[in-house]
Amino acid sequence: MKVNLKLIIGSILISQAQAIWPFDSSGSSSSSDSSPSETGSSGGTFPFDLFGSGSSLTQSSSAQASSTKSTSDSASSTDSSLFSSSNSGSSWYQTFLDGDSGDQKTDYAPFNLTCPSKKTFIRTASELSQQEKDYIHKRQETTNKNLIDFLSKRANLSDFDAKSFINDNAPNHNITIGLSFSGGGYRAMLAGAGQILGLDGRYEDANKHGLGGLLDSSTYVVGLSGGNWLVGSLALNDWLSVGDIVNGKSTIWQLQDSILNPSGMRIDKTIAYYYGLAQAVQAKEDAGFQTSVTDTWGRALSYQFFEEDDSGTGGANITWSSIRNLSSFQDHSMPYPIVVANGRTPGTYIINENSTIFEISPYELGSWDPSLKSFSNIQYLGSSVNNGNPNNTDICVNNFDNAGFIMGTSSSLFNQILLQLDNYSINSIIKMILEKVLTDVSDEEYDIAVYEPNPFFGADSAGIKSITTNDTLYLCDGGEDLQNVPFYPLIQNKRGVDVIFAFDNSADTNSSWPNGTSIQETYKRQFSKQGKGTPFPFAPDYKTFLDKNMGDKPVFFGCNSSDLEDLVAWHENDKINVTDVPLVVYTSNTRMSYNSNFSTFKLSYSDQEKFGAIRNGFETVTRNNLTDDENWSTCVGCAIIRRQQERLGEEQSDECKKCFQEYCWTGGFKDAASVSSVSGISGLAAKTHTSGGTSSTTQQTSTTTGSSANGGSSSTGSSSSSKKKNGGDLVNGGVPSSIFLVFNSLLGLIIAYL
């Protein structure tokens, strides 16, 4: 904790420098701004005054923003010397240095209790856990009813009896829908917020002009990194609707000030904030547990993701497993939430397709991959075990699975900065310093989350013993293997997912738009030892993705299961049928009414930016409020029922065939991302369709240009030309924010050597 505390002290010092930093520390030169009240092609302002909803995003947020801003302004303008007059002459700084905790809480620390009578905490990953089975069984009683309603009213399929189709076939198979939200920092959280809002039947405008009811019909929801900030913060706030955030009923996601400097110029409040973080993490260390920067990062995130209570501890005592106790979970009104993270071996920087992918649910942490093939009870993380059996039945641990820590685990940023440093336009001398600092930080493993004791120590089902012989389990950002859209939990055959709605808000190009890398990498992974047994539809490489403008509108992958016969056969698992491979409905972040291509490392957002990104996300998933395609909801209905129709041998309707002609990518092995090095796969080239056709090629590209609100350089919102030019380059924005993160570490390291 000594170095960790010094890093925090460094953060305090450097956070104050933001006031005089010569660049925009909250913005990205790769993102263009436009007002959220700006009229898009749909006309009207979000949320849809045009349609008579009687509410305006600008209006609904203005009171809240004004209240927040007045507090912030008064805090920053009352005393130009950075100190509140109430603290004048006081020894707040001495209190900090002396370590007087005042009334700060330490609920973050895990604590001991007697072990439960069940003596083993791990199981082999051969089936779903009984708890998940029970939840899904009850959840699908609800989703079936909601899906009947969605297909009948929203999709309005012709000559289709939704009630009999769903109910008559339920004894054999319930249609299972999974939602997958990509990583990408606050950009992904906010764009994803608009996308999930467009599916939410609790939000009236989604029912009138979107896909309202689809969220209510979904069985699973998965998030990674920034996408998990979305999923986690909604789930842990008792399945909060984004509509309540938009309308000011909830005060979470206050992003006006950077997470590094949430109190603006009030250095006394900043000191108290960082001291609270330090004290919480120190309490965990004092309890005998190793900590890392992820602990501090997770605690900081919690202040933004949870409503403040009287204790003022910012969710310090909220655990991931406590989702089980929420009313929306107990009545099965929320989809089953899952987080994705990666295993990261200490000393490594690059995580390839053979990495171990972990998933975290309200009940378990573990991996289906053959390298581990085990799951552990998340409630007892931190307990010392051997093959899941407590080493001391009198002492088990609770509270290790802090919600902020779990969300921080899935979004560690430091290794990402190191991996992408060459893509930043930084002065060579500064770059040399940063490389040295980042190497030192990475060498000390500050960029990962530390799970010690290792919950899988001695696990006998693991294929790679190095995971189970180490006292510590190391996890990191779920997108570091380039699978930034978390498909992994949803392609496990045991879950029986029919269709995945994937929302890609990645920053693959220099302009911070997606280029299909995520879906390409998941497709390729199935041909590795780790991925064998998880068939995934053919997917194009990023060049094809850009050439065909596939980011401009949704694309369906794996439309016809008959095209996947040889692909499934390659997996050599007779328990997997072609209809078990989910159809993927892929939606990319693209400009509709707002340039939401912010840097991943942008750490503060004005209300204009926040609500502009949410609005734009809503429009991407609803095809611009159904104005770009009035039949979009019908086509979504066709995608949902496709696999069940194929199981039953039912012919697709003419209207669904028309939808598939419009949205399906029909490329086969020859058109897909290259996997030429994979043994035994070459025969597929001659056996699959090679048209690669999709009418996405005819979609006009958006080339609206917006200017940055802060007077910085502007960039085009094009989803085609700019992406083609940039190809597969990594994000090149947000340098100031990244530098602040790096300088936090730099100052901490300097202090460490004093």
Swiss-Prot record:
Disordered, as annotated region: 25-88, 687-727
Signal peptide feature range: 1-19
GO MF annotation terms: lysophospholipase activity; phospholipase A2 activity
Which reaction(s) are listed as its catalytic activity? a 1-acyl-sn-glycero-3-phosphocholine + H2O = sn-glycerol 3-phosphocholine + a fatty acid + H(+)
Q: Which GO terms describe its biological process?
A: glycerophospholipid catabolic process
User: Cross-referenced SUPFAM superfamilies, in alphabetical order?
Assistant: FabD/lysophospholipase-like
Q: What is its EC number?
A: 3.1.1.5
Annotated Gene Ontology cellular component terms? cytosol; endoplasmic reticulum; extracellular region; plasma membrane
Task: Provide the top EC class.
Answer: hydrolase
Do the record's keywords include Cell inner membrane?
A: no
The positions flagged as glycosylation sites are 112, 156, 174, 317, 325, 354, 391, 423, 470, 510, 515, 560, 577, 597, 625, 631
- Biased region (Low complexity) positions are 25-40, 50-88, 687-721
Cite the entry's keywords alphabetically.
Glycoprotein, Hydrolase, Lipid degradation, Lipid metabolism, Secreted, Signal
Major location (coarse): secreted
* Origin: domain of life: Eukaryota
PLA2c domain sequence ranges? 114-670
Q: Which PANTHER family match?
A: CYTOSOLIC PHOSPHOLIPASE A2, LYSOPHOSPHOLIPASE 1-RELATED
Q: Into which family does the record put it?
A: Belongs to the lysophospholipase family.
Function as written in the Swiss-Prot or TrEMBL entry: Catalyzes the release of fatty acids from lysophospholipids. Phospholipase B may well contribute to pathogenicity by abetting the fungus in damaging and traversing host cell membranes, processes which likely increase the rapidity of disseminated infection.
What is the designated name of this protein?
Answer: Lysophospholipase 3
Identify the species of origin: Candida albicans (Yeast)
